[in-house]
Curated annotation (Swiss-Prot):
Binds 1 Mg(2+) ion per subunit. One of its GO terms (cellular component) is chloroplast. Residues 303-318 are annotated as: Binding of phosphoribosylpyrophosphate. Transmembrane segments: none annotated. It comes from the Eukaryota. Its cofactor is Mg(2+). It comes from Arabidopsis thaliana. One of its GO terms (molecular function) is magnesium ion binding. This is Ribose-phosphate pyrophosphokinase 1, chloroplastic.
Length: 403
């Protein structure tokens, strides 16, 4: 039976990171970083310093990808864990990656001072998935990094099989690290005879044998209640806030905008940490799935720098129509800040249309090179996830990271 395998080496190379300066909240320093080379999807970013603008050989423009390293940690993290890590060859903490986002997993491993665990993942000719752990996990605290992004069902099934493999190999604890949780939007019924797929997926992960879930910026907080196991909800706002602070935008010019009524709580929390900026709300009504209609604006944005905050960008209809309304109401500039870059067609065409000054996302799921465009900025959440994993492993407080 034919198969396609993915095997991680016993000691993956440490990635090279780049950032121009250390940033702190609302400092006068500026962060401007360009990458000059990218490896394939199954490797980490390779970055070199560019003192002058240098074109990338990509179709849609030059993405700006600041990646945090030990010199440029945001203020909420004190230092990298390299010097604090346990013996690499004799540890009860194991970190494995699925095939969905191995670049992020490698960055997390670098921050933690660990090597990624060796695992062989295959796709058989009929589409079945095969997983074999190539090192012992007996009695270990195992963390599996696997966002359930596109192809959603395939990546979800791979995660379930990885969890099962760890459980059958006598791992002491298995934590599913899910930077992007697919099906999170199916968290309630909006019409009769619909399923609540988020609850179903939570049940599948639990029944597969996971002891804990670590997820980033869930679509709704109540999704945590669908699990019968502990869930650590990681908020990626500090990474985005730290980057915005490096742009030195005067606080009196800022206004935080929620693209819909449902995101008001998220935008309010963001505004409070962004110099307690004023809040505006875009009132929209949906006529169907992935279709948004902007109706009205609540709040004043005239002459302001508008920061639109949401958990994800899918087809970008909400963000782009909201940006058009903000410009119509007199906003000077519009930024979009979202954790998850889903980027389903026709998102790239919409986002690169000129309405947005900058589109700021994170690397919770991989962004294909074909989807790069000049306004795109990708921030790494590897340090945030790495620190969270360490604290869970050490039985320390996780919530204190975000206070």
């Amino acid at each position: 039976m034919a198969s396609l395998g993915l095997s991680f080496p016993p000691a993956a190379k440490t990635p090279t990171y780049l950032a121009s300066s250390s940033s702190t909240f609302f400092s006068n320093s500026s962060l401007s970083v360009r990458t000059s080379q990218f490896r394939s999807r199954n490797s980490v970013f390779a970055c070199v310093k560019c003192d002058m603008p240098e074109s990338l050989n990509v179709g849609n423009g030059n993405p700006s990808i600041p990646i945090i390293n030990e010199r440029t940690l945001p203020k909420f993290l004190e230092s990298a864990r390299m010097e604090k890590s346990v013996n690499r060859t004799n540890t009860r903490l194991k970190l494995f990656s699925g095939t969905a986002n191995p670049a992020l997993a490698q960055e997390i491993a670098w921050y933690m001072g660990l090597d990624l665990g060796k695992v062989n993942i295959k796709r058989f000719a009929d589409g079945e998935i095969y997983v074999q752990l190539q090192e012992s996990v007996r009695g270990c605290d195992v963390y599996l990094v696997q966002p359930t992004c596109t192809p959603t069902n395939e990546n979800l099934m791979e995660l379930l099989i990885m969890v099962d493999a760890c459980r059958r190999a006598s791992a002491k604890k298995v934590t599913a690290v899910i930077p992007y949780f697919g099906y999170a939007r199916a968290d309630r019924k909006t019409q009769g005879r619909e399923s609540i797929a988020a609850k179903l997926v939570a049940n599948l992960i639990t029944e597969a044998g996971a002891d804990r879930v670590l997820a980033c910026d869930l679509h709704s907080g109540q999704s945590m209640g669908y699990f019968d196991i502990p869930v650590d909800h990681v908020y990626c706002q500090p990474v985005i806030l730290d980057y915005l602070a490096s742009k030195s935008i005067p606080s009196e010019d800022l206004v935080v905008v929620s693209p819909d009524v449902g995101g008001v709580a998220r935008a309010r929390a963001f505004a409070k940490k962004l110099s307690d900026a004023p809040l505006a709300i875009v009132d929209k009504r949906r006529s169907g799935h992935n279709v948004a209609e902007v109706m009205n604006l609540i709040g004043d944005v005239r002459g302001k720098v508008a920061i639109m905050v949401d958990d994800m960008i899918d087809t970008a209809g909400t963000i782009v129509k909201g940006a058009a309304l903000l410009h119509q109401e007199g906003a000077r500039e519009v930024y979009a800040c979202c954790t998850h870059a889903v980027f389903s067609p026709p998102a790239i065409e919409r986002l690169s249309g000129g309405l947005l000054q900058e589109v700021i996302v994170t690397n919770t799921l991989p962004v294909a090179e074909k989807n790069y465009f000049p306004q795109l900025t990708i921030l790494s959440v590897a340090n945030l996830l790495g620190e969270t994993i360490w604290r869970v492993h050490d039985d320390s407080s996780v919530s204190s990271i975000f206070l």
